[in-house]
UniProtKB/Swiss-Prot annotation:
Globin domain: residues covered: 11-150
SUPFAM superfamilies listed in its UniProt record: Globin-like
Entries under InterPro entries matching the protein: Globin, Globin-like_sf, Globin/Proto, Globin_lamprey/hagfish
Any one GO molecular function term: oxygen binding
Alphabetical list of Gene3D superfamilies matching this protein: Globins (1.10.490.10)
Coiled coil: none
Signal peptide span: none
Subunit structure and binding partners: Monomer.
Organism for this UniProt entry: Lampetra fluviatilis
Record: residues binding heme b: H74, H106
Domain of life according to the entry: Eukaryota
UniProt-recorded name of the protein: Globin
Family named by the database record: Belongs to the globin family.
Length: 150
């Protein structure tokens, strides 16, 4: 299933949730490194996205990005937001509330182009569980909610 950022997706099944938790656990247990690797892959594959991160401007190499405290800080925030979504899979109202709040911040305060949520979600899905339809469904749920304030 490709990741979508509009419309709706079917609820996650119990089997999908179990598989997501199993795939996510080793990534989150090493969240500092995993988060930086994901964010660096995102920026090196989509350099235009860096314009929304003034502190990252001018960092053109993966090595520069990996050494940046600002990149590490933001990577941790992204990983924690995904972890919150994984932890809230059984309480979609809680997940929705948190991600809608995050959407508002990104739309109003940071003025991030929402197309990049889907791109980042694809990098995360590829890193965590490449080709897994359940994880892609979770990433779709996240993307749809992150676009809610736009």
């Amino acid at each position: 299933m490709p990741i979508v950022d509009s419309g709706s997706v079917a609820p996650l099944s119990a089997a999908e949730k179990t598989k997501i938790r199993s795939a996510w656990a080793p990534v989150y247990s090493n969240y500092e490194t995993s988060g930086v690797d994901i964010l660096v892959k995102f920026f090196t594959s989509t350099p235009a996205a860096q314009e929304f991160f003034p502190k990252f401007k001018g960092m053109t190499s993966a090595d520069q990005l990996k050494k940046s405290a600002d990149v590490r800080w933001h990577a941790e925030r992204i990983i924690n937001a995904v972890n919150d979504a994984v932890a809230s899979m059984d309480d979609t109202e809680k997940m929705s509330m948190k991600l809608r709040d995050l959407s508002g911040k990104h739309a109003k305060s940071f003025q991030v182009d929402p197309q990049y949520f889907k791109v980042l979600a694809a990098v995360i899905a590829d890193t965590v569980a490449a080709g897994d339809a359940g994880f892609e469904k979770l990433m779709s749920m996240i993307c749809i909610l992150l676009r809610s304030a736009y």
